[in-house]
Amino acid sequence: IDTGEGTLTGGRLKRVADYVEGEDEFCMTYGDGLSDIDISATITFHREHGRLATVTAVKPPGRFGALELEGQRVTGFVEKPTGDEGLINGGFFVLDPHCLDLIDGDDTTWEDEPLTRLATGDQLRAYEHHGFWQPMDTVRERNLLEDLWASGGAPWKTW
């Protein structure tokens, strides 16, 4: 799907609407992180709670915004807590296609209004993942992941 260079994350996600129409749910992830998340367990969790969206919650180094949770209910977001106390958006989602209705167009950022509306509307749950998760936002992180792959010790390679 050609989303165009200037399209924000929400607009990119909205472009898959025709492909997921009629489905009960679909999976979405960002392209800048790797994990050994059990996708089947995440889908099962999503189906069990009956909400529109599930986000994976992970504990990273303390350089990301954090999810505020009451149990598994996402109630808000905290920008970059110190240390690694908070759970963050791990970037792996299970979504009901109706989530796409919350996206206005190409200038919508998925992480802003759509996710906030899902959280405040009690339609977002967090699946806590305690295994391997690593972003690739810096050269250092890219090198770390490439070294893991080259060594044969890539925890995300589950096939």
How would you name each of these model-derived features?
Residues D24-T29, L34-S35, I39-R47, K59-G62, ...:
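Catalytic-core segments of class I nucleotidyltransferases/pyrophosphorylases
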Residues R12-V16, T42, G50:
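Generic hydrophobic alpha-helical segments
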Residues I1-C27:
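Short phosphate-binding loop-to-helix
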Residues T56:
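Extracellular glycan-interaction surfaces
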Residues A66-L69:
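Active-site and channel-lining beta-strand-loop segments
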